[in-house]
Amino acid sequence: MGAVFLSGRSGSGKTTFILNEIREKLRDEPLGKPIIFLVPDQMTFLMEYELSKTPDLGGTIRAQVYSFSRLAWRVLQHTGGMNRPFLTGTGIQMLLRRLIEEHKGEFKVYQNASDKSGFTEQVERMLTEFKRHCLPPQSIRDMMEGTGKSEYEDERILSDKLHDLYILYSKLEENLENQYVQSEDYLTLLAEQIPYAEEIRNAAVYVDGFHQFTPQEMSVLEQLMVHAEEITFSLTADKPFTANSPNDLHLFRMTGKAYYDLYQKAKELGLDPSEVRLEETKRHRHHPELQHLERYFDERPAKPYPGQTESLRIMQASNRRTEIEGIAREIHSLIRQGRFRLRDIAVIARNVEDYKDTIKEVFKDCELPFFIDGKESMQNHPLIELIRSTLDIIKGNWRYEAVFRCVKTELLFPEGQPKERLREQIDQLENYCIAYGIKGDRWTSKDPFVYRRYASLDEDFAKTDKEIETENMLNELKGWIVPPIHRLQKRLKKAETVREMAEAVYLYLEEADVPMKLEQERRLAEEGGRIAESRQHEQVWDAVIQLLDEFVEMMGTERISFALFQQMIETGLESLKFALIPPALDQVFIGNMDLSRMYGTKCTFLIGVNDGILPARPADDGVLSDEDREWLKRNGAQLAATGREQLLDENFLIYMTLSSPSEKLYVSYPIADSEGKTLLPSTVVKRLNELFPDSEEKMLIHEPEQLDDEAQLEFLVNKGIALSHLAGQLGIWTRQYAISDVWWSTYNFLMNEPDRIFSQNILSSLFFRNKVENLNRHVSRDLYGEHIQGSVSRMETFKACPFSHFASHGLKLKERQFFKLEAPDIGQLFHSALKLISDRLHELKLDWRDLTKAQCETLSSDAVERLAPKLQKEILLSSNRHHYVKQKLQKIIARVSGILSEHAKASGFAPVGIELGFGGKGPLPPMRFTLKNGCTMELVGRIDRVDKAESSKGLLLRIVDYKSSDKGLDLAEVYYGLALQMLTYLDLSITHSTDWLGMKASPAGVLYFHVHDPMIQASVPLGLDEIEKEIFKKFKMKGLLLGDQEAVKLMDTTLEQGRSNIISAGLKKDGSLRSDSDVVAEEDFHVLRRHIRRTFQQAGEEITDGKVSIEPYKLKDRTPCTYCSYRSFCQFDESLEENEYRILKPEKDSVILERLKKEDEADGDF
């Protein structure tokens, strides 16, 4: 038995030396004694490939490539030790989750942290570390007791941490003892079984690719030294460390220490170790710059390289995306030149997670095949989401978020139906559930979903055919979504043990045909050449079944709550990862600096070389802090590297990466992060500049215009990328700047290729202006017809912004409805409740002035109770919170009813019409217009309230409109067409008064009544009567009144002098109207009536002529865009030349009236 220690710097040919020696043995004796090639997990596939591609070998059965775990499986299969069930890390984490829940009450430090996400994984990592470093629970207890008596607080806190870890560690071992085995146990078992392994006893063992070893691995290597026929260790070091371990600042500290420990162990075992030192760095012999870098990287002071650097390039970029885009272009350039294959290229980062998403996106766009080394979480796979969301449905009482997370995995979709149609229907169902607040037993009830697109508080309409069709579709979806989940819910409720719970989940997946659906997806991915995706579908099902099996194996007969069951399943699912191997041989390798192993790499891109990232700052996010680890190490406990040791080893990892390529090295760094914050270059960049003072840094540019023509050609990676950059260049050209002829050639090529339609559509966006052309006559007629029936508010919308009108009434776009009570719903309730109360008073032959406070409360309560089931999908009946809101609304309506009663007592006006309809079946006809373009238009709607009074001058009519906000009448808004309702209602009432009331009426005014429950503020305490008076004042009606003393007194019979508490008017001592009264002459009302008719005529003609321009108004600081639903759709942007507000000048009422009179005179009779 002999031990050979092979050493050499990076690139000296150690791995090639071993491979050649193995090849020679295979050539000499193809079926000779076993050859074991022991390498890290990340290197097994690569070494197997290197051996298998040797052209003159008849086979490699004799030689096997192993990692430690694969060797353990092989040996234990032959010698025994595999009779206990194996628990994966997933199973361990699930078991730990249960132990944490059971014992967290005993914790001294981690009681609060135990409920946080990731805690179980951190504990599992810590306990794994204990095992790998051969520290049993008793050792942890001894350290705990040793620190617990310390006079220092930090050490006592460490003792408390060890106390909590000891509880979990000891309980875990109790659960595993003599029943299960975990991955870390296999190395211990391997070390025990090697003496009995026949294939080891005669084997030649080669160990390569490792930088250091855990105590567990050292125990295995010790047994291999004893029992293997020969063993060769290969370690990257500048010399054999036979007598002393290197000092802490030595570049090869990590590997040198491993060399020394192994060498000393070989001597202890009585072996005669020999050393082979490879002096020459063969990897870089044709590239002196790389040879210089490898040789002098760690020498101080730096030895400058005399000359240009063809094989080394330093690059900087504005951000990470630009960095990766530049690297992708460089890779394409290298491939086009024929110098490299994709498999010759590696992209290495200190932490590839920082770049993973960007690399995936950019390399996919650039059509660069790649493989990211490392395990990827299964969290985003549909099967994992199906299980998690289904359990969330059961836990959360069928909340819609969880339901649609589940449904959108598409694993519950029934077979044989087109997925596109189902997706569209699911979107409709989701909209329905959001709008109707569907949750809980509304899913599981046998009662079908009820769908109403149109609803009214005042009338019951029959369902339309479209509503019935939609309702049937919704219930059909419910019919296949609910049963499997509901069956699972029932089974879990009945389940008494973990086995029964796990079986319920398995049955759920089987009944939903999940295995068959995954197999179909796997086959489709395979047929489409998506090999990695195909393997994922295969692995995820196996992983879930193994998870359930382990769960049952560990706790099958135990009883646990559903909450703990879900927590443990969640913990298990979070730990599942895909074990991927490269799906193809020719692809770019993407890896982590510390974990990835490379061989035969010709070109390396080291990315993200920024300060704080490289060298990496040690992470201090475990359950033990770096100070804890330092203390334990000083007191004899051997654990993984401390933060200080990790920092010392960073230089070695950087050295290994920089020296990994044989021909070309690129080092790049961004100067800003994704948020624009400055990033500094790493000290590695400074070091490279010291070693290569003549090297020039290249700036990776996102846009090509700053480069010469030849460099711009690099941006033509493929058609898609070329088109993207061409669009940018043509955008520059449209701003009157010259662009390279490269882009005109690209333009000509794309415009003349067979598939040019796509390119034409993309490039047409360059000439886009956010300006809408008016519809032509035919389109307008098709959209609106030749007869328009609309409302006053529709005309106000058009006058506010024609495009908003087009979106809402032309395209009929609607926002997604939500199950919540909003201001329009409350306003609708107020209107309908007051109408019901008025109707009830009419039935009882009572007047408003006859009402008592008790009657107001009773009538209000009855009205709200009748309306609640009809309002917004029964929202007021949906929860205790909304029940409280309903009571508040009843209180407001009772308060308002009382005020209306008081108003009636002090008024000579009485209601003559409530919710008075005009047009349709209403008592008043619509307002009709014949438009100049031959179309017709009629306006229909309802008037909240019309009051009448007899005066010495005849019949007077006034309009009262109920508003849930405090509002007055601004004549500027009337003039610009933004507030037309009140005067329209007055015009209709006056115009048709003879037919309606039997006599001609005159206008008395228009008033807004604010429906609310006012809050009274006072500087001194007030009595109840004073409070009621103040409340009464808060209901003063604002608007515009007839400037006639008799009319004003009819509206407030209590008014003698001063301001009225009922209307916005007042009288002086001499009986004349106060100057601050909101009044106009009767003729002014007629001028206003004629103006609104002209406004409607103009709006109708513009609508039917196809006006759809984006022209929102701006009046003072008010614009319709503030609350517009279509803002993101119209994309109005004031910074664009073609987008500007239509500025409306605010004017005093007197100025507006004068202007209207002049316009009236100019137009003549309307």
Swiss-Prot record:
Residues that coordinate or bind ATP: G8, R9, S10, G11, S12, G13, K14, T15
UniProt-annotated binding residues for [4Fe-4S] cluster: C801, C1121, C1124, C1130
Cofactor(s) it depends on: Mg(2+); [4Fe-4S] cluster
GO BP annotations listed: double-strand break repair via homologous recombination
Domain UvrD-like helicase ATP-binding: 1-285
Keyword annotations: 4Fe-4S, ATP-binding, DNA damage, DNA repair, DNA-binding, Exonuclease, Helicase, Hydrolase, Iron, Iron-sulfur, Metal-binding, Nuclease, Nucleotide-binding
InterPro entries cross-referenced by the UniProt entry: ADDB_N, DNA_helicase_suAddB, DNA_helicase_UvrD-like_C, P-loop_NTPase, PDDEXK-like_dom_sf, PDDEXK_AddAB-type
EC annotation from Swiss-Prot or TrEMBL: 3.1.-.-
PROSITE patterns with a match to the protein in the record: UVRD_HELICASE_ATP_BIND, UVRD_HELICASE_CTER
Enzyme class, UniProt record, top EC level: hydrolase
Record domain UvrD-like helicase C-terminal: where: 279-586
SUPFAM superfamilies hit by this protein: P-loop containing nucleoside triphosphate hydrolases
Cofactor stoichiometry and binding remark: Binds 1 [4Fe-4S] cluster.
PANTHER family: RECBCD ENZYME SUBUNIT RECC
Subunit structure, interactors included: Heterodimer of AddA and AddB.
Reported function: The heterodimer acts as both an ATP-dependent DNA helicase and an ATP-dependent, dual-direction single-stranded exonuclease. Recognizes the chi site generating a DNA molecule suitable for the initiation of homologous recombination. The AddB subunit has 5' -> 3' nuclease activity but not helicase activity.
HAMAP family: AddB_type1 (MF_01452)
Additional note from the record: Despite having conserved helicase domains, this subunit does not have helicase activity.
Recorded family membership: Belongs to the helicase family. AddB/RexB type 1 subfamily.
Protein name (Swiss-Prot/TrEMBL): ATP-dependent helicase/deoxyribonuclease subunit B
Organism, as annotated: Bacillus licheniformis (strain ATCC 14580 / DSM 13 / JCM 2505 / CCUG 7422 / NBRC 12200 / NCIMB 9375 / NCTC 10341 / NRRL NRS-1264 / Gibson 46)
Organismal lineage: Bacteria, Bacillati, Bacillota, Bacilli, Bacillales
